[in-house]
């Protein structure tokens, strides 16, 4: 009887470990796929518009506006800044204020070949809609001359939240995301943590 009980206990522990490992691998793959999709949108905007058209060209503004329209389910807004943080172009729902002190701006300036994921920002309080502030260093054309700057894309968090929310309901584990300064980007129990 004791041997049988030990066998069952060992079996259940092993199955739990295997299931947790499988869930972790699926979660990692789903998040990786979503990040690849986001990065692809960001790189497409950069290489096919920002780097291709002079910002003084009316096609530049039209193409960026169309990019937002065609991705309206995922993109809240776009903006382009010079390396001093001065706004060069922004979509209608963003402000033209200087951004040189924002963490997403300095991260993009300091990490030239990296797409930087900044903190969440609430954009629709009534619907509790949030965006990730995603940025990257870019080269743009202004009056025929190549310049350096930062591209900001505000991307709705819904797709990543949906992936992570699935794991909130598991019996034995949950997942959370942190930014590079150890602030929560996502935690399934953030409301409970915030309220103490």
Regions inferred by a protein language model and the residue ranges of each:
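Juxtamembrane extracytoplasmic/periplasmic/luminal helical "stalk" adjacent to the first N-terminal
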Residues: 1-54
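Stable alpha-helical elements in mature extracytoplasmic
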Residues: 27, 38, 60, 104, ...
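Extracytoplasmic/periplasmic ligand-binding sensor regions of membrane-associated signaling proteins
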Residues: 48, 71-74, 78, 83-157, ...
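Short, surface-exposed beta-strand-loop junctions and turns on beta-sheet-rich folds
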Residues: 95-96, 191-193
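A charged amphipathic helix-loop-strand protein-protein interaction module that recurs
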Residues: 104, 192-196
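Short, hydrophobic-rich beta-strand element in sensory/regulatory alpha-beta domains
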Residues: 42, 75-80, 173-176
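Sec/Tat-exported extracytoplasmic proteins
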Residues: 31, 46-49, 68-72, 168
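Solvent-exposed, extracytoplasmic
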Residues: 57-71, 150-192
């Amino acid at each position: 009887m004791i041997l049988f009980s030990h066998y069952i206990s060992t079996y259940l522990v092993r199955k739990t470990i295997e299931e947790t490992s499988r869930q972790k691998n699926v979660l990692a793959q789903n998040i990786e796929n979503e990040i690849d999709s986001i990065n692809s949108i960001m790189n497409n905007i950069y290489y096919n518009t920002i780097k291709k058209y002079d910002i003084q060209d009316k096609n530049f503004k039209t193409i960026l506006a169309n990019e937002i329209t065609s991705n309206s389910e995922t993109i809240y807004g776009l903006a382009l800044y010079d390396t001093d943080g001065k706004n060069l172009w922004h979509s209608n729902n963003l402000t033209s204020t200087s951004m040189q002190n924002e963490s997403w701006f300095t991260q993009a300036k300091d990490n030239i070949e990296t797409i930087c994921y900044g903190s969440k920002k609430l954009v629709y309080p009534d619907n509790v809609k949030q965006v990730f502030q995603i940025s990257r260093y870019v080269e743009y054309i202004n009056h025929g001359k190549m310049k350096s700057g930062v591209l900001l894309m505000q991307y709705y968090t819904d797709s990543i939240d949906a992936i992570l929310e699935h794991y909130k309901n598991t019996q034995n584990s949950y997942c959370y995301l942190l930014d590079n300064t150890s602030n929560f980007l996502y935690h399934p129990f953030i409301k409970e943590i915030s309220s103490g």
